[in-house]
Structure formats: C-alpha cells, structure tokens
Design a protein with these regions (language model features):
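Non-catalytic terminal/accessory segments
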Residues: 1-196
Length: 196
C-alpha cells in the first residue's frame, strides 16, 4: 500500500511505480487489485483504515469481524462432539491468535460488546449439557442460586439462547466463574498484550 495526500498524487505515483515494479523488480501487478482509492473502507490483510484527527488509524475490517463471529459460533457448537476441556482449549487458542494478529487495531468498544455475546454462547453450552430439570436444579444450587429461583429456572421452558442471557444464569455462570475454569476473553487478553 502506498499512501498519498490526494487522488491526483496517488494517480501520478501509480503511473511511476508500475514500470519500476514490472521492469526493475520483474513483478506482475494485479490490475484488479491495483486501485487508487480513498483509504476508508480499503481491506488490507484483514484490516481497514480511517482518519482520526488527521492521522491514519487501523480497524478490523467488517469481513474479518464476520469471519471471527462465524468461527466462534462453530467453536461453541455442541455438534462438534468435543468435551468442555477440548472446546475451552480451542476457544482460548483462537482468542489468543486472533487478538495477537489484530492487536494494532482500535477494537476496545467492539471487544467489550462481543465478549458479552461470547460468554452467552458458553453459558448456553453448559445449560444444554445440564439437560434434565434435576441436573439444572443441582448445578444452580451448587453455584449459589437460592432454592426457589433454582427450581423456577430449572423448570423453565425458555429456549437455550434466551435462558443463557437470564440474570440467574449470568449470576451462576459469572465472568469470574468462567475465568476460574480457564476461559480467556477477548477484551481482557487485548489489555494484557497492548500498552496504550
């Protein structure tokens, strides 16, 4: 990528650089991918760019975010037949890898929001695993939920996704609990590997 101050300047640069790349470096320029464009919205190695206070900044491209959401959904699917330990390991590996690659981007706000969705997916897995009313009741009690509420939620007919966002399930499978059993979350890991 070559950054210029104006479109005319970019067009002149392209005219000059193309012969150098093809005749001096013996490289072929891809006509479809070689464009003069405003920096906003351009996708490059999963990143996109924007201008803030006169300076170029990095964001994660929407397509990269969509791909990440799809992958998290796959990893938190119970149809893959993994046990909790293997799934947790796979998820943590993905969180570390994704964050280390995109740590240069401005993603704080997105990560805080996405972690809520991510934790809800994890809670849904556990709720599905508990299956029977008595099993749900036993685990809820074990995790500190009072008897009447535990019985009420254990008997709930609400769908898995909906119940995973309920106050009781959020309280029993809290952030502290999930971290305690080894889960890593995007925003926490981002803070750990970046110095702002």
């Amino acid at each position: 990528m070559i950054f210029c101050k104006s479109k005319k300047s970019a067009e002149r640069t392209l005219e000059k650089i193309q012969p150098f790349i093809e005749k001096k470096l013996y490289l072929k320029m891809n006509e479809e991918k070689t464009v003069v464009s405003y920096v906003k919205g351009v996708k490059f190695l999963g990143y996109t760019f924007y201008i803030y206070r006169g300076k170029g900044r990095l964001r994660v491209h929407p397509k990269s975010i969509a791909k990440m959401k799809k992958r998290i959904k796959e990893l938190t699917s119970r149809s893959n037949g993994w046990g909790n330990e293997k799934r947790r390991t796979k998820l943590n590996e993905y969180v570390r890898g994704w964050m280390n690659y995109f740590k240069l981007a401005d993603v704080k706000t997105f990560l805080k929001s996405f972690d809520g969705y991510y934790r809800r997916r994890i809670r849904m897995i556990y709720w599905k695993q508990w299956k029977k009313v008595r099993t749900k009741f036993r685990y809820l009690r074990k995790l500190g939920i009072e008897e009447s509420k535990a019985w009420e939620y254990a008997n709930s007919r609400k769908g898995y996704w909906r119940i995973a966002n309920s106050p009781i399930v959020n309280r029993s499978l809290s952030i502290q609990f999930l971290e305690g059993i080894g889960y890593i979350f995007f925003y926490d890991y981002y803070q750990k590997i970046t110095v702002n």
